[in-house]
């Protein structure tokens, strides 16, 4: 995992506790080609665990370079096998205009 993401692990834990058990909070690690979950709380919502691959929606955001146009996407519809439809939001963690952990040659 990119060392610049390490402080966000604490933020994931904080948000999970502050928002409560009905909110899953996930930190993605983009250093590998497929990307993985680096930290997750309240994973009873999706059943995902650390090391699991990114969701299809996260991959669409990355491949569509949504992060170049906006800092976050809020209130879109997600889905979970365990919980059905979800209200989801994504914040892009960047260094300048680049996603942290996403190398230039994989863009």
Identify the residue ranges that each predicted region occupies.
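Short amphipathic alpha-helical segments
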Residues: 5-13
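Structured interaction and signal-relay segments at domain junctions
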Residues: 16-74, 79-81
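A short beta-strand signature within small-molecule sensing/ligand-binding domains used
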Residues: 84-91
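Sensor-regulatory modules in signal-transduction proteins
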Residues: 93-96
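Glycine-rich acetyl-CoA-binding "A-motif" of GNAT/NAT acetyltransferases
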Residues: 99-100
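Conserved small/polar residues in nucleotide/adenosyl-binding loops
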Residues: 105-106
């Amino acid at each position: 995992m990119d060392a610049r993401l390490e402080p966000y692990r604490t933020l994931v834990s904080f948000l999970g506790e502050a928002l409560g058990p009905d909110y899953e909070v996930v930190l993605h690690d983009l250093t590998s080609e497929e990307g993985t979950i680096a930290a997750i709380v309240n994973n009873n919502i999706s059943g995902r665990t650390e090391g699991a691959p990114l969701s299809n929606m996260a991959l669409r955001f990355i491949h569509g370079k949504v992060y170049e146009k906006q800092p976050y996407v809020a209130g879109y519809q997600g889905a979970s096998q365990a919980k059905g439809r979800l209200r989801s939001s994504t914040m892009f963690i960047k260094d300048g205009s680049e996603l942290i952990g996403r190398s230039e040659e994989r863009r």
